[in-house]
């Protein structure tokens, strides 16, 4: 065996374009270092390749996995590319630009809009010194939208990542949970440079796919707005007309809205005829119940509403007939050290001021 592994020299690859430069990986009987592939460096003075060595023993499938990873270009950064992180928002976008070694090239904030996005693309090209847009890798937390579409149209390679996954990369820089646009943009640029496998390269979608995506987004927005309005309706009906809530779980149903428009208050619900309810149910093809059960649902609520309205109307009259003690000047009543008048003990009508005077 000797003092160490006797490696045969790897052949120096010739300059290649678009071909696989990796020669067959040599197998070693043992040792502390195991070459698993070639690290290719495209420098101005030529292309060089050398074995990648591990200081710990690497055997079997692990060696093959690392070799395949190096063949795909993972684990190495391309010095010819620049990496930009875009922390997007509804009003402004924070951009952080680095080179292939992770050194900061520039940082700037752009307003959201047509002019702002065009200025962002021009600034990336001018600051990085790139000739083509595909020399700049851009990281962003959203897979679609005007920012993504503008950058793709200008030729940039846009890569998307899930915001939850981005939070884990943020722990590399700081453990603080406060929102920082500059730090988030820097984290995205650094993560794209070191871990490109965690990102998803975006491409221009088919026009039909874009149209379907916009229609589905509109449908989701309308559904969310409908839920918001029905929740407000449920709260209001629970306050003054809870009987309607027992008729239908979906407060956005057309027949229930029509019924509510016909009897907006419990007083009107008490005067509605069953024939009117029957016509309404027939018009909307509601066969779960007939008019009499529906009328029985809303009749008790109407009576309860009338009783409550009577109590509300009687409160001012009761308050007007209540005896009020005459107000006395502040000098006679006295004041506490805090400046508030001294509170008198509560006395009911049976043992009030008249009873004390009689005693």
Curated annotation (Swiss-Prot):
Region (Disordered): 1-31, 318-359
Keywords carried by this UniProt record: DNA recombination, DNA-binding, Plasmid, Transposable element, Transposition
Keyword Nucleotidyltransferase found: no
Source domain of life: Bacteria
GO molecular function: DNA binding; transposase activity
Record flagged with keyword Membrane: no
GO biological process, one term: DNA transposition
Pfam assignment, any one: DEDD_Tnp_IS110
InterPro entries named in the record: Transp_IS110-like_N, Transpos_IS110
Family (UniProt): Belongs to the transposase 9 family.
Protein's recorded name: Putative transposase y4uE
Organism of derivation: Sinorhizobium fredii (strain NBRC 101917 / NGR234)
Taxon lineage: Bacteria, Pseudomonadati, Pseudomonadota, Alphaproteobacteria, Hyphomicrobiales
């Amino acid at each position: 065996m000797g003092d160490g592994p006797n490696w045969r020299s790897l052949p120096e690859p010739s300059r290649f374009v678009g071909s696989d430069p990796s020669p067959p990986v040599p197998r070693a009987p043992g040792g502390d270092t195991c070459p698993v592939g070639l690290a290719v460096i495209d420098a101005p003075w030529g292309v060089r390749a050398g074995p990648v060595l591990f200081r710990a023993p690497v055997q079997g499938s692990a060696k093959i996995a690392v070799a395949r990873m190096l063949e795909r270009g993972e684990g190495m950064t391309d010095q010819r590319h620049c990496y930009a992180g875009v922390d997007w928002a509804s009003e402004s976008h924070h951009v952080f630009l680095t080179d292939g070694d992770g050194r900061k090239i520039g940082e700037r904030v752009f307003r959201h809009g047509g002019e702002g996005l065009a200025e962002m693309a021009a600034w990336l090209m001018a600051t990085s010194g790139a000739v083509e847009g595909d020399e700049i890798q851009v990281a962003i937390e959203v897979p679609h939208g005007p920012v993504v579409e503008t950058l793709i149209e200008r030729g940039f390679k846009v890569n998307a990542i899930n915001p939850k996954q981005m939070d884990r990369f943020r722990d590399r820089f700081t453990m603080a949970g406060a929102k920082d646009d500059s730090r988030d943009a820097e984290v995205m640029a650094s993560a794209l440079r070191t871990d490109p496998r965690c990102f998803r390269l975006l491409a221009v979608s088919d026009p039909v796919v874009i149209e379907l995506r916009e229609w589905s987004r509109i449908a989701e927005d309308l559904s969310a707005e409908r839920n918001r309005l029905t929740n407000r309706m449920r709260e209001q009906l629970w306050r003054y007309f809870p009987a309607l809530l027992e008729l239908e779980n979906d407060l956005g149903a057309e027949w229930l809205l029509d019924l509510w428009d016909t009897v907006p208050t419990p007083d009107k619900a008490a005067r509605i005829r069953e024939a009117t309810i029957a016509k309404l149910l027939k018009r909307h093809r509601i066969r779960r119940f007939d008019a009499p059960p529906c009328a029985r649902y809303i009749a008790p609520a109407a009576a309860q509403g009338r009783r409550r309205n009577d109590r509300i109307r009687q409160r001012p009259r009761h308050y007007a007939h209540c005896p009020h003690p005459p107000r006395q000047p502040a000098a006679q009543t006295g004041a506490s050290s805090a400046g508030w008048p001294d509170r008198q003990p509560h006395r009911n009508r049976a043992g009030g001021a008249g009873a004390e005077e009689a005693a």
